[in-house]
Regions:
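Active-site-proximal substrate-binding groove within the catalytic cores of carbohydrate-active enzymes
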Residues: 1-106
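C-terminal beta-sandwich/jelly-roll accessory domains of carbohydrate-active enzymes
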Residues: 75-151
Length: 151
């Protein structure tokens, strides 16, 4: 569901046949989509560089926030965690980076940095752009959403 936040959030599904858990998941997705839509559809689209070809990252950077969708499309070639640098942020501001798990948590392996398991961290824009965030070692075909807001 994380990658569908980047486009038109429609459902090719007979939602009248959904059970309570599925209906609740759709409601959480719709709420998150509505919240993030102004940034995703109105921000600049950037593609942070990642070394391992299994990673994909798409950042939407607006005037007041950023949304980053991070995914793996295959098994990681390198077991060592990679850093995600977030371009386009004001280097002089502090930002709160939150992992948005409303639509499900990504499955990951043996490396999960504290900021990821805790769900949020506050850092300067300069550090996010130059040093970046250590990524968890996601299993194949997993994704997560980061919401970046100034504090």
């Amino acid at each position: 569901m994380a990658t569908s936040l980047m486009g038109s959030a429609g459902f090719e599904w007979d939602i009248l046949s959904c059970d309570e858990a599925e209906t609740a998941a759709i409601a959480r997705f719709a709420a998150l989509y509505k919240e993030l839509r102004p940034v995703v559809h109105g921000g600049r689209v950037l593609h942070p560089e990642l070394r391992d070809p299994a990673w994909r990252a798409t950042a939407f950077v607006g005037a007041t926030a950023a949304v980053v969708v991070v995914a793996t499309v295959a098994s990681l070639e390198d077991a060592r965690a990679e850093r995600l640098r977030l371009p386009g942020l004001d280097p002089d501001r502090r930002y709160r980076v939150r992992v948005r798990r409303e639509i499900g948590a990504a499955e990951y392996g043996w490396i999960a940095p504290e900021w990821f398991t805790a769900g949020e961290i506050e850092l300067p824009g300069s550090l996010l752009a130059e040093v970046g965030l250590q990524l968890p070692t996601l299993w194949p075909l997993q994704a997560f959403v980061l919401h970046v807001e100034p504090v």
